[in-house]
């Protein structure tokens, strides 16, 4: 006979309440109103004993999931701790410094009763942790739990892959000087399957809009900002970078297995829960964090980032992914790139499609839109008129002609009406001839050269730099006629001595040609550099700190040449005293020419004249050549006159 035992049934009721009772969570935090989880829970104790026996809290993947690093592995790390700075990421009060305590707290959280809002449960918020622990331990069958927000965001059933998007450099913003990286989640969803509608992950600094440029640079360099991940549809990033800032975007599909895609997607979701890191422009930036996220695809010690590195550059991450290969039989990790051209590139290509008469008509319409009714414009055949008006509309968008007067609005309406009556043209704008960033030279460089100085004799020179690109280098996939070089260090060795001949902190130059391809359009060229250099080439130990910057004009007559004129302002000092600083101006004239892709020459001369401080007046002339051997090697020949004639023959290795 069945005997009713209140104590027996109360134990089952307690177990039911522990497993199925509800609670509430605050989005992005780990606080809960659920009943306290008992440390005596037999399921928890069994799993914890198993985890302790397997030493899971020391497993490389668990440390990856918590972003734990040892001393020197990550910038600002002086002890074994997590890079995450906000408490909401940790389920244990000691989780930031103790991975064992965080593992215990995670086990308790994933076994805790289901809450009213399933999205707040640890199995949904920390889905990467839960899935890895479940695959590593003998979990019992748990109550089914749907995660509506994650499922809607990830759309795993229709996911087709992950792409990394490289955004070209933007010299008007220091944080984007070396480019930017995005991570794009692709799917075949009928609503969000279009490339522009796909979820895209971004990492950036949480800046204060009231900070002036000096404070902005200072805080960015020394960790004064926090960084976080955000996600938006890809069209938003394409609009910001490609349309507003005229930056090319290169999309590289990643050859990950479905399981690897899931691992990356799981942790990406965790990072979107208001997780914050300390942001450093040169290291803890988008390049470092995006590469770190991709490392989640492997549950072992696989790294894409370099431990102990002092900088992280977006294009360097793309090169690392290109070289990355887990085995000799599988495909490379980085797939073939697709160019998403900037608004400026598309406009230039449209203008290039016009013949001389059509370009002349376009210039007239830019000056006076009412020329739409002129006999001259109407004399063009309809396809030509359509081409001209398409270029005109692109030009107006490129110039951001938005705040229109009433009359201009009427002219714009008329322009659109006229265009609507003309035939639709096949878009012949092509990007097939454009080379991707991974076809150019890698960003790091080692230099070995032999030097002969007319006064000081021969020497051996070694040097290194961290750069995005230099003016004389191969421009494949890089900003055209631009230079971004940092930390350019050069040492010279003579018989029984060595000397520091140069330590350039930064050297940024932009030689702007016609931005649209329309005759008469121009932008100012500009450049700036600063660092320690020799006072002149006739004195070996004479060094000074020199800062230079200026504006100029650049033109091209044949497409493979650039002629330029600059007026620079400069400051030179040998001491830290303000009174010892020489300030002056320096007009320059020069040219660059690349008759074939593997060969480029540059000539430049300048006259320096002081107007304040110790008087100085001198000329500097330089002639350089570059001959490309392979993608990773080139030869440079440099001849310079600065008090003494000096020649250098150097071999460069890029990696």
Q: What does each of the following model-derived ranges do?
A:
Residues 464, 626-627, 643-655:
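Outer-membrane beta-barrel "beta-signal"
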Residues 456-462, 483, 497-503, 541-549, ...:
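Residues that define the transmembrane beta-barrel architecture of outer-membrane proteins
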Residues 158-246, 464, 473, 491-503:
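Glycine-rich catalytic cores of cysteine/serine-nucleophile enzymes that process amide/ester linkages
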Residues 444-446, 462, 485-487, 520-528, ...:
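Transmembrane beta-strands of outer-membrane beta-barrel proteins
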Residues 32-119:
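Long, charge-dense tracts
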Residues 287, 335-479:
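Outer-membrane beta-barrel initiation region
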Residues 234-315, 574, 638:
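Active-site nucleophile-His-acid catalytic modules used for acyl/amide transfer and hydrolysis
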Residues 469-477, 510-519, 556-565, 593-603, ...:
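Repeated loop/turn-to-beta-strand initiation elements of outer-membrane beta-barrel proteins
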């Amino acid at each position: 006979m069945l005997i009713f035992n209140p104590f027996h049934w109360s134990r089952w009721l307690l177990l039911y309440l522990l497993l199925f009772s509800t609670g509430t969570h605050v989005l992005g935090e780990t606080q809960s109103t659920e009943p306290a989880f008992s440390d005596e829970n037999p399921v928890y104790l069994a799993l914890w004993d198993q985890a302790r026996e397997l030493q899971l809290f020391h497993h490389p993947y668990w440390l990856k999931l918590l972003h734990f690093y040892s001393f020197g592995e990550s910038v600002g790390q002086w002890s074994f701790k997590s890079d995450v700075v906000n408490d909401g990421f940790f389920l244990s009060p000691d989780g930031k410094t103790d991975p064992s305590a965080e593992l215990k707290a995670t086990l308790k959280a994933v076994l805790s009763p289901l809450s009213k809002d399933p999205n707040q449960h640890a199995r949904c918020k920390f889905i990467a942790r839960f899935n890895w622990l479940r695959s590593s331990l003998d979990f019992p069958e748990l109550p089914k739990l749907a995660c509506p927000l994650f499922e809607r965001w990830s759309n795993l059933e229709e996911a087709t892959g992950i792409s990394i998007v490289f955004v070209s450099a933007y010299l008007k913003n220091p944080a984007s000087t070396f480019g930017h990286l995005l991570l794009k989640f692709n799917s075949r969803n009928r609503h969000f399957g279009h490339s522009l509608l796909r979820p895209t992950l971004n990492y950036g600094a949480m800046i204060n809009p009231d900070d002036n440029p000096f404070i902005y640079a200072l805080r960015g360099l020394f960790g004064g900002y926090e960084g976080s991940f955000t996600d938006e549809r890809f069209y938003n990033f394409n609009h910001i970078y490609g349309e507003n800032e005229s930056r090319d975007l290169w999309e590289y599909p990643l050859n990950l297995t479905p399981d690897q895609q899931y691992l990356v997607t799981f942790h990406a979701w965790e990072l979107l829960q208001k997780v914050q890191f300390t942001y450093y422009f040169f290291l803890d930036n988008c390049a470092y964090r995006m590469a770190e996220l991709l490392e989640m695809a492997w549950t072992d010690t696989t790294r894409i980032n370099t431990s102990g590195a002092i900088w992280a550059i977006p294009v360097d991450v793309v090169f690392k992914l290109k070289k990355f290969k887990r085995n000799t039989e599988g495909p490379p990790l980085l797939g073939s790139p697709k160019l998403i051209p900037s608004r400026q590139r598309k406009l230039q290509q449209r203008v290039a499609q016009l013949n001389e008469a059509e370009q002349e008509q376009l210039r007239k319409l830019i000056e006076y839109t009412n020329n739409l009714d002129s006999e001259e414009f109407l004399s063009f055949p309809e396809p030509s008129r359509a081409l001209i008006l398409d270029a005109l509309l692109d030009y107006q968008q490129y110039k951001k002609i938005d705040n229109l007067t009433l009359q201009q609005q009427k002219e714009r309406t008329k322009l659109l009406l006229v265009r609507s009556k003309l035939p639709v043209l096949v878009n012949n704008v092509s990007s097939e001839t454009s080379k991707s960033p991974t076809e150019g030279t890698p960003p790091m460089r080692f230099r070995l050269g032999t030097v002969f100085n007319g006064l000081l004799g021969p020497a051996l020179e070694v040097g290194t730099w961290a750069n995005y690109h230099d003016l004389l280098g191969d421009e494949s996939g890089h900003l055209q006629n631009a230079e971004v070089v940092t930390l350019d260090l050069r040492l010279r060795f003579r018989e029984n001595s060595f000397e520091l001949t140069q330590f350039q902190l930064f050297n940024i130059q932009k030689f702007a040609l016609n931005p649209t391809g329309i005759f008469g359009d121009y932008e100012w060229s500009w450049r700036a550099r600063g660092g320690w250099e020799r006072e002149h080439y006739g004195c070996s130990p004479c060094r000074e700190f020199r800062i230079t910057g200026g504006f100029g004009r650049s033109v091209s007559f044949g497409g493979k040449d650039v002629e330029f004129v600059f007026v620079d302002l400069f400051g030179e000092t040998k001491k830290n005293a303000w009174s010892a600083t020489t300030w002056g101006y320096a007009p320059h004239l020069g040219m660059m020419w690349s008759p074939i892709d593997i060969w480029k020459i540059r000539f430049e001369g300048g006259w320096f004249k002081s107007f304040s401080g110790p008087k100085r007046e001198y000329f500097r002339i330089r002639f350089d050549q570059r001959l490309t051997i392979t993608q990773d090697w080139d030869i440079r020949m440099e001849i310079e006159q600065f008090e003494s004639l000096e020649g250098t023959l150097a071999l460069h290795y890029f990696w």
